Amino acid sequence: MSKSKDDAPHELESQFILRLPPEYASTVRRAVQSGHVNLKDRLTIELHPDGRHGIVRVDRVPLAAKLVDLPCVMESLKTIDKKTFYKTADICQMLVSTVDGDLYPPVEEPVAPADPKASKKKDKDKEKKFVWNHGITLPLKNVRKRRFRKTAKKKYIESPDVEKEVKRLLSTDAEAVSTRWEIIAEDETKETENQGLDISSPGMSGHRQGHDSLEHDELREIFNDLSSSSEDEEDVNVIDTEEDLERQLQDKLNESDEQHQENEGTNQLVMGIQKQIDNMKGKLQETQDRAKRQEDLIMKVENLALKNRFQAVLDELKQKEDREKEQLSSLQEGLESLLEK
C-alpha cells in the first residue's frame, strides 16, 4: 500500500497520570464515567512556565500540582469493546495534586556560577526533587531503590585535553636522548620456571642419581687403572685387553642408562598415582561432608515425605562414598607395589 505525500501525519498522544486526593478523585471519576459534556468546565489543568508545577481545578477548587518522573515507562492502552486493546502512548510522568500545597511556588532565578562543575551539580540536585521513588500501586513503594540498579557513571574526557596530552607525550619522546623498551612474555617465564623444577621426589631421585654417578666413577677408575697397567705388557695383548675393556665399559654404560630411564619412568608413574590419590582423598572428604550435612538436615525435618526424599539423597551419597573408598584403596595398593619394586 503506497502512501501519498498529501497524507496528514499521525497525531501522537502525550499522556501523564493525574493523581488527586481521594475525595476529588471520586468526583472526577464519576464525571468521566457519566460522560458529561461540561467536563472541561469541571476539570482544568494549568502548568506554570517551569513545566514542573501547576494548578489543578476540580469544580473550581484549586489544588497544587507537581509533575514528577516515574521510575520507568508504562504503556497506556485504549479499548472500545473491552475485548480489543490499542496502545496509545508511553507514560513516564505523573501529576501529583495536593490540597495543602503551594499554588504559586517561588521561581528560582538562574544564576550563572563561575565553576561549570558547580552548575552541573546544582542542575542534578534540582532534577532529584522531581524524581518519584514509588510506583503507582502500593506493593511498589520505594521501588526505585529496591528494584532498580543505580545508573553507572560514565567519565568522558574532552577531546582537546586528550590531544594536548598526546602532543606532550610526543614532545617528551622527541627530546629523549635514547629510548629503551622490553617485552616480557608471561607464558615463557612460566615455562622456564616449570622446567627448572624437579618433577620427581627429592629423596628417591637424589639416591638414584648418586648411585648412577658412583657406577660411572667406578667404571672410569677401572678403565684408567687397566689402561695404565697395560703399558708394560706386549702390544698384541694391550690391543686385545683395550678392546675387551671398551666392550665391557660400553655394556655397563648401556645398562646404567636403561636403568636410569626405567627409574625416571617409574618416578613419573609414582607421581601420577600420588596425584590421583590426593584428588580422590579430596573428593572423598567432600562426599563425607555432604553426607554429614544431609544427616543433620534429616534430623531437623519433620515432614515425612521430605524426610524420605532427603534419605534417598543420603543413600546415594553413602554409595558414592563406598565407591570412592574402593578406588582410593586400589590406588594405594598400586602405589605400594611400585615402591616395593
Swiss-Prot record:
GO BP term (any one): RNA polymerase II preinitiation complex assembly
Gene Ontology terms, MF aspect: RNA polymerase II general transcription initiation factor activity
Record flagged with keyword Glycoprotein: no
Record keywords: Coiled coil, Nucleus, Phosphoprotein, Transcription, Transcription regulation, Ubl conjugation
An annotated GO cellular component: MLL1 complex
Database matches in CDD domains: TAF7 (cd08047)
Residue positions where Phosphoserine is found in the record: 171, 200-201, 213, 256
Chain intervals for the UniProt region annotation (Disordered): 105-126, 188-212, 321-341
Claim: Lipid biosynthesis is one of the keywords in the record: no
Principal place of residence: nucleus
Places the protein is found: Nucleus
Biased amino acid composition, Low complexity: 105-116, 328-341
Coiled-coil zones: 236-341
Function description: The TFIID basal transcription factor complex plays a major role in the initiation of RNA polymerase II (Pol II)-dependent transcription. TFIID recognizes and binds promoters with or without a TATA box via its subunit TBP, a TATA-box-binding protein, and promotes assembly of the pre-initiation complex (PIC). The TFIID complex consists of TBP and TBP-associated factors (TAFs), including TAF1, TAF2, TAF3, TAF4, TAF5, TAF6, TAF7, TAF8, TAF9, TAF10, TAF11, TAF12 and TAF13. TAF7 forms a promoter DNA binding subcomplex of TFIID, together with TAF1 and TAF2.
Assigned protein family: Belongs to the TAF7 family.
Listed name of the protein: Transcription initiation factor TFIID subunit 7
Organism encoding this protein: Cricetulus griseus (Chinese hamster)
Gene (UniProt): TAF7
